[in-house]
């Protein structure tokens, strides 16, 4: 019988946020949402700013915010190498909304392609954080 769990490691440059056994993992990939279950095919993909959601072996759901990175799926093992990773309950709604407002203002006032691209990236990160905070409040 095939195993019904996966080993998950979520690592950023600053910290190892999680290492343990989980039932499922959901990640925002570069092409959309990815649901990873035991037996998933090997995969290597870029991840966008967004949520990493996992269900622990005990059935508890956890949400993390990642600001991009790489996802590697191997038989029985998932690794998230994040540029920045923060536990969902450590995110600050007021700070995220202020970052969203700054990014929107920068987009409206951008004079160069570089400034515009940076503002779009900042807006994407802020919206992802706000989304995670709202999901945690449900």
From Swiss-Prot:
GO terms for molecular function: ATP binding; proton-transporting ATP synthase activity, rotational mechanism. Its main location: membrane. InterPro entries: ATP_F1_dsu/esu_C_sf (IPR036794), ATP_synth_F1_dsu/esu (IPR001469), ATP_synth_F1_dsu/esu_N (IPR020546), ATP_synth_F1_esu_C (IPR020547), ATPsynth_dsu/esu_N (IPR036771). Coiled coil: none annotated. The keyword ATP-binding does not apply. Gene3D superfamilies: ATP synthase delta/epsilon subunit, C-terminal domain (1.20.5.440), F0F1 ATP synthase delta/epsilon subunit, N-terminal (2.60.15.10). It is a peripheral membrane protein. One of its GO terms (cellular component) is plasma membrane. It comes from the Bacteria. It is found in: Cell inner membrane. Keywords: ATP synthesis, Cell inner membrane, Cell membrane, CF(1), Hydrogen ion transport, Ion transport, Membrane, Transport. Belongs to the ATPase epsilon chain family. F-type ATPases have 2 components, CF(1) - the catalytic core - and CF(0) - the membrane proton channel. CF(1) has five subunits: alpha(3), beta(3), gamma(1), delta(1), epsilon(1). CF(0) has three main subunits: a, b and c. HAMAP family: ATP_synth_epsil_bac. Produces ATP from ADP in the presence of a proton gradient across the membrane. NCBIfam families: ATP_synt_epsi, PRK00571.1-4. This is ATP synthase epsilon chain. It comes from Idiomarina loihiensis (strain ATCC BAA-735 / DSM 15497 / L2-TR). The lineage of its organism: Bacteria, Pseudomonadati, Pseudomonadota, Gammaproteobacteria, Alteromonadales.
């Amino acid at each position: 019988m095939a195993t019904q769990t996966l080993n998950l490691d979520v690592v950023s440059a600053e910290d190892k946020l999680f290492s343990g056994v989980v039932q499922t993992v959901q990640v925002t990939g570069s092409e959309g949402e990815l649901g990873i279950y035991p037996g998933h095919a090997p995969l290597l993909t870029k991840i966008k700013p967004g949520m990493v959601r996992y269900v622990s072996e005990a059935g508890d759901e956890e949400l993390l915010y990642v600001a991009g990175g790489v996802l590697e799926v191997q038989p029985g093992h998932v690794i998230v190498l994040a540029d920045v990773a923060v536990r969902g309950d450590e995110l600050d709604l007021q700070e995220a909304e202020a970052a969203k407002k700054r990014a929107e203002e920068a987009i409206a006032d951008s004079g160069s392609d570089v400034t515009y691209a940076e503002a779009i990236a900042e807006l994407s990160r802020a919206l992802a954080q706000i989304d995670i905070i709202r999901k945690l409040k449900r």
